[in-house]
Amino acid sequence: MFSNLQYNPAFAGQTKMINAGLLAREQWTGLKSAPSTQVLNGDMWFKFGGLGLSVINDRLGYEHSFRFNALYAYHYRLSNKMQVSAGAGLGIINKSLQGSQLIYVSQNDQNAITTDISEYNANIDLGLSIVYDKLIAGVSCTHINKSVKASDFTTPPRHLWIYAKYSYTLNDLIKLQPSLLLKSAFFKTQLEINTNCLLKDKYWVGLTYRHKESVVALIGIQLNQHIKAGYSYDLPFGPIKGQSYG
């Protein structure tokens, strides 16, 4: 859960530093043409808010998706402990499919895509967030310019995201950071529940549960004040259990 800029532009510039993050996810590594995702996020604070960018490259078999978003967030401090933010993201999405490589069970399928296609579309994201003491929460809508009914392969439907995280200090050595992420395309919803344990403000271990999909183990280290690195390992269950790992 270190990539919240990709789904909520209101998080841009919430810390008075220049931030950059790179995330790579290789799913179902025991299977051919398994999902592969790379995410690059960056943001910075300035006097009138926050600026950022989010780049996502995603591949699944013969399907490829690329998204670039420029982000802006306005932050308003209500008190020493509370800040509310509103953000917007504007960018492009490219979706492509090697339809000529697909094999269909029925040769008479009227919905079959048999040629290679690639299309660019505009993308708009909107989000809100609140920081109160040790609580961070946000709600956002991505691809807001496309309804579920108007969407198709090249234009993803709008998604709703709800995020919350709380940081609890047990003692001078240990902090617990439980969080949850709910994401919904309205016809499909997924819930992630996560807990990270931060040791000496330098090392962390964590566990994530994705409803009806997988359990994820996480480890990481804060290399210095500005750089941290982490690794996660998925333990899937359901239909792909025993056929994939990592």
Predicted regions and their residues:
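Subset of outer-membrane beta-barrel
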Residues: 1-246
